From Swiss-Prot:
GO aspect biological process, one term: mannose metabolic process
SUPFAM superfamilies: Families 57/38 glycoside transferase middle domain (SSF88688), Galactose mutarotase-like (SSF74650), Glycoside hydrolase/deacetylase (SSF88713)
Protein name per Swiss-Prot or TrEMBL: Alpha-mannosidase G
PANTHER family for the chain: ALPHA-MANNOSIDASE 2C1
Species per Swiss-Prot/TrEMBL record: Dictyostelium discoideum (Social amoeba)
InterPro entries (alphabetical): Ams1-like_N (IPR054723), Gal_mutarotase_sf_dom (IPR011013), GH38_C (IPR041147), Glyco_hydro/deAcase_b/a-brl (IPR011330), Glyco_hydro_38_C (IPR011682), Glyco_hydro_38_cen (IPR015341), Glyco_hydro_38_cen_sf (IPR037094), Glyco_hydro_38_N (IPR000602)
Annotated EC: 3.2.1.24
UniProt keywords, alphabetically: Glycosidase, Hydrolase, Metal-binding, Zinc
Catalytic residue positions: 376 (nucleophile)
Cofactor(s) for this UniProt protein: Zn(2+)
Family according to the record: Belongs to the glycosyl hydrolase 38 family.
Length: 1087
């Protein structure tokens, strides 16, 4: 035996000696690795292959014609599937052996036996390799096996060309490298695992650690006593390892790690939704098999969508999942439909993620989830704690902030508080991964990196291969079992998320609190990448909102009408909000699929809205049955029902929770309306008649289109018209004026001056600064192309687009300036940017309707406004509220937020004056001093090299205002720019004096937004969701202009639409208290 002094003097040499004894590359004939396999045979395995197929069932697959194939044959191209028929004849002399089948096709596969999905296979050579299936224990020799393997021609991480996140290589092929059976040397494999763990301790523990020195000593002693050519020494060495190292146990004060088996499955990323369905089957079947091997093993899985896909495509496997849920080994978690993006979905989308997720889990498995599970997303909205609590969950797990590239997040276990004061118990697994390999390094890191270990010495380890699926491997489970109570290593418990949080609960009072958003200091480009998807998502959210409101009205007031079930449409939209879909970080085929989904949802909504409008119109034409209109609200007047039908009307519906007055274009598709509306006081530049409509909140009006005159008609003249003039000087400037603002547009399209008249304030800084500067920046990053927008990109502006302007509409309803930007300003010289700058007679808002043909590479298009406003902070709309962020870079935490998320608006205000920058489909804002900007388009080249290429249409707006954002109705302007209103397609005749304004459900306070009106999921009532938008406690009453009030009672409920004994009940006119930014959900019980 080597003396201890020599070993200790040469610690690093000894560690490397251990490494070489375990190496699969060096000295394999002399080391332990070379003795892991006792027997192997490829001759015993016969393989035949089918033609390439797409998405066929096992029943159909076994009917295919198969031909012989062999090791070395390749299969492809990318994304295609093949089925293999495998027959095995076990050698007769392999008696009493445990036999393993080995398969490596360099891609993903699934073993099928007798119509049952048995186990997933993952080819290649990386740590995710899973090529082994235990065929039989205690073989009698001579057995015959026949089964099938379905392969998908893609790696665990897709088919990126020459790199993980590179665009797909459509012509990849995958080689069959192994198809054999083996008998493993059981003792050699067990010894190998013990030595590997000793090596990990020696490699990763601190240099002066006693356990490090002990591990190196014991491992070195084992190597000295092990004769690799005499397997009898293996058992002796195993006992030596146990006795000298692993038999030493922890004290009661040792920290504990709760090991949660997990499989992170990206529903799309470097593969499509369709391929994810296969990944689910491979992953889940494998973990169920391991549950049979290891009764102590528990596996947790989130995302109702993944379960739903498995139920639809692999029903037998799904039944086995349900069986394991009952036994407590397969643990549904998370509570949401998918693991969604944490920044970009609307508040209602967040609610629906939980609503449909929790309903699915309760229906399918008999219980709801008790924790929100979102390990991998790119930031976390400050409104999430309230949403989580509103959906009946109190605990939250994630870890992504460990990727921060500037500041280290200071907590592992803490209380996270949202903008309304709601809080959730939150844990960031200290191993800083959701794909832990359950090795010594990461187990110890779960303790050593626990930033709150002085307050709570419990931590979670999320272990298992993931992103592309897979889950825990047998070595992971066995390592955790061996290390369960080994001195120097945290105590380990096989656990579930719920069991873990039960251990945290007693420590709650000692934990620190983090208030506000969990901002992710990386992946800021995901606020902008894949602009078409982001626009589609915004439109779907808006149209579903309107569709639910209209159909709810129709169910109450249109005889025989039944609200359609919109849950399937919602679930499609929620799927597209997955955290690699909506952010823009997936491959091209994903966005082709998402575009189809969004288009389908929008078509369905349009059809339902059209039908609903027709139903309402039909009801109105029954003159004698027109519902009485209240005279007690400001938005309505008494109906008149004269029988003389001498005017043409259209029905207009407003899905905003406030009264709107808009200038509208009558589209060419409405030829019947245009035929009646022939005396328009203004025609648009593209030949469409313009008119003005005023509509009540959450309701509809009958609009007179054939009579000019008062505010009940579409064709009325403004008291203060909007005008535009071109200055008679060399500047070529254009001046637009209305009642509220005066704006000077330079000949190049930039804003030189913007005066808000009520405050007599200049908005644009008058030192040569400008507004509407369209700037192109170099947009490269450190690695994650589609994900990252770095601060240094803003240091390198390449060009400011130069335009030419002309007036194309000149009042009285609106003025429009057309700006054509020179394509020479585009680095590629290939493309176009055109704008129409629009000012309406009745608003201080200036709209910039923008059309871009974008063909750049690694460039960023953004718009900046240099304002004359001095504010230390700016406000940004988020879900159900807004948050404040600094406009300076005082600290590294401030500097890190150089690009932040805002939804429909951001507002920069000093006392009593400010300006909002609004948008209809963008999310990436930046504010520094008085400059406020919006990212419009990016052009990353991986993983989708077509990202954002082609045509785009979007609108951003500026809204100068006197007063605060609350008093100036910035929130309303954001909704107004985004939410549609709807006009019936066919005119109808009523008495010219008829005045019909109907508000379905609203409130008496501007601060309270009625965000959702829908049919309850159980069909027994209607659900109304409101939130307080100003950030202050108040009271409110519900209002309606429909009498008699069609509801007998209102019951407050949670976001799952559940009522319990403590639920408050109200009458329709009761006063209700609400806290700052609070979300409230009510069930309206109809008469």
């Amino acid at each position: 035996m080597t003396s201890g002094n020599v070993m200790l003097k040469h610690q690093d040499v000894t560690i490397e000696r251990i490494e070489k004894f375990l190496s699969d590359t060096y000295f394999v004939r002399e080391n332990l690795y070379g003795k892991l396999i006792s027997l192997k045979s490829s001759e015993a395995v016969k393989v035949k292959v089918s033609p390439k197929v797409e998405g066929i069932s096992y029943k159909d697959a076994i009917q295919l014609e198969y031909k012989d194939t062999k090791i070395g044959e390749s299969f492809g191209p990318s994304w295609t599937n093949y089925w293999f028929k495998v027959t095995i004849d076990v050698p007769t002399d392999w008696k009493d052996k445990t036999i393993h089948f080995i398969w490596n096709s360099s891609c993903e596969g699934l073993i099928w036996m007798n119509g049952i999905a048995i186990q997933g296979l993952i080819g290649g050579t990386w740590q995710d390799l899973r090529e082994e299936y235990k065929l039989i224990e205690n073989s009698k020799g001579g057995e015959h096996f026949e089964f099938y393997i379905e392969i998908s021609c893609n790696g665990m991480f897709g088919v990126g060309k020459d790199g993980l996140i590179n665009p797909c290589d459509p012509d990849r092929t995958f080689e069959l490298t192994k198809a054999e059976i083996r008998v493993k040397n059981k003792e050699a494999n067990e010894l190998y695992m013990y030595l590997q763990m000793l090596y990990d301790v020696g490699k990763n523990f601190p240099k002066e650690s006693l356990r490090k020195k002990q591990a190196i000593w014991v491992a070195n002693d084992i190597i000295n006593q092990c004769n690799v050519n005499d397997s009898r020494t293996f058992s002796k060495c195993i006992e030596l390892a146990k006795k000298e190292f692993f038999s030493q146990h922890n004290s009661e004060s040792q920290t504990r790690v709760w090991a949660v088996g997990h499989c992170h499955i990206d529903l799309c990323w470097l593969w499509s939704f369709e391929k994810t369905k296969e990944k689910c089957a491979r992953s889940f079947s494998t973990q169920i098999l391991y549950m049979d091997y290891y009764p102590q093993f528990k596996f947790t899985q989130s995302q109702a969508q993944a379960y739903q896909w498995t139920k639809e495509n692999y029903p037998e496997l799904y039944e086995r999942i349900k069986e394991k849920v009952v036994t407590g080994q397969f643990i549904p978690t998370g509570g949401t439909w998918v693991e969604m993006d944490g920044n970009l979905p609307s508040g209602e989308s967040f609610i629906r993620q939980f609503l449909y997720g929790q309903r699915f889990f309760e229906k399918e498995f008999g219980k709801k989830c008790t924790e929100f599970f979102l390990p991998d997303t790119f930031g976390y909205s400050a409104q999430l704690p309230q949403v989580i609590r509103h959906m009946g969950i109190e605990n939250f797990i994630t870890q992504k902030l460990s990727w921060n590239n500037l500041n280290k997040f200071p907590h592992s276990t803490f209380i996270w508080e949202g903008i309304d004061g709601s809080s959730v118990l939150t844990h960031f697994p200290p191993a800083d991964t959701y794909n832990s390999q359950a090795d010594v390094k990461e187990i110890v890191m779960s303790s050593s990196n626990n930033k709150d270990i002085d307050r709570c010495n419990e931590s979670m380890l999320l272990y298992g291969n993931g992103d592309g699926g897979g889950g825990p491997t047998i070595p992971m489970i066995e390592r955790l079992t061996i290390l369960k109570d080994t001195a120097g290593i945290p105590k380990i418990e096989f656990s579930t998320p719920a069991q873990f949080f039960k251990q945290l609960e007693p420590h709650r009072s000692k934990l620190n609190k983090w208030v506000g958003e969990l901002y992710f200091e990386l992946h800021r480009g995901t606020y902008t990448s894949q602009a078409t998807t982001k626009r589609g998502n915004r439109l779907c959210e808006i149209e579903l909102h309107a569709t639910e409101m209209l159909t709810s009205y129709c169910e109450l007031f249109v005889e025989g009408f039944k609200s359609p079930n919109l849950s399937k449409l919602w679930q499609q939209v929620l799927l597209c909000q997955f955290h690699d879909a909506l952010p823009g970080s997936s491959i091209q085929v994903c966005y082709e699929d998402i575009l189809k989904i969004h288009q389908q949802v929008l078509v369905e909504c349009k059809n339902i809205i059209t039908q609903s409008m027709n139903h309402i119109t039909g009801t109105l034409l029954k003159i004698d049955n027109l519902p009485t209109t209240s005279t007690t609200t400001s938005t309505t007047t008494t109906s008149t029902t004269e029988c003389t039908k001498n005017s043409e009307f259209v029905l207009a519906f407003n899905a905003n929770d406030f009264e709107i007055s808009r200038v509208i274009e009558i589209p060419k598709s409405n030829k019947d309306i245009q035929a009646q509306y022939i005396n328009a006081i203004q025609t648009s530049y593209n030949g469409l008649p313009l008119g003005t409509v005023s509509l009540p909140p959450n309701g509809f009006s009958a609009i007179n289109i054939s009579t000019s005159g008062d505010n009940r008609t579409i064709n009325r003249k403004p008291g203060y018209p909007c005008t535009a003039i071109e200055k008679n000087d060399a500047s070529g400037d254009i001046l637009i004026d209305n009642q509220f603002i005066s704006i000077v547009i330079g000949s190049n399209g930039r804003i030189k001056s913007l005066i808000e008249k009520s405050a007599n304030r200049e908005v644009i800084k008058q030192d040569g600064s400008l507004g509407n500067r369209l700037i192109i920046f170099d947009d490269t990053c450190l690695f994650w192309d589609a994900w990252d927008q770095e601060i240094f990109s803003l240091e390198k502006p390449l060009s400011i687009l130069e335009g030419t302007c002309k007036i194309i509409e000149n009042g009285p309803l609106r003025c429009v300036v057309q700006v054509h930007y020179d394509s020479k300003g585009l680095p590629s010289g290939n493309g176009s940017v055109n704008q129409t700058i629009i000012v309406h007679f009745n608003s201080a808002r200036v709209d910039f309707e923008t059309n871009v043909n974008w063909n750049e590479a690694h460039k960023l298009l953004r718009v900046d406004f240099d304002t004359n406003i001095r504010a230390k902070n700016a406000n940004y709309e988020i879900q159900f509220g807004h948050i404040e962020r600094p406009t300076h870079y005082n600290t590294s935490w401030d500097f890190a937020r150089f690009e932040v998320v805002g939804h429909k608006w951001a507002d920069l205000s000093e006392y009593d004056f400010g300006m909002a920058l609004l948008n209809d489909c963008k999310y990436g804002y930046s504010t520094l001093g008085g400059r406020i900007g919006l990212s419009l388009l990016r052009s990353p080249k991986s993983p989708d090299d077509t990202c954002d290429m082609g045509s785009h249409k979007f609108t951003y707006s500026i809204y100068p205002h006197r007063g605060s954002l609350q008093s100036a109705s910035v929130i309303k302007e954001g909704y107004s720019l985004n939410n549609n209103f709807y006009i019936s397609e066919t005119p109808f005749s009523l008495a010219s004096t008829t005045h019909i304004d109907k508000t379905f459900i609203s409130t008496n306070k501007e601060a309270i937004i009625v965000d959702t009106i829908k049919k309850a999921e159980d069909g027994t009532s209607f659900v109304v969701r409101v939130y307080e938008s100003f950030g202050g406690a108040t009271t409110f009453n519900f209002t309606s202009s429909i009498l008699p009030i069609p509801f007998k009672s209102i019951i407050e409920c949670n976001g799952l639409e559940e009522v319990n004994q403590s639920s408050k009940s109200y009458k329709f006119n009761d006063t209700i208290k609400i806290n700052p930014f609070e979300i409230k959900t009510f069930r309206f019980i109809s008469n």
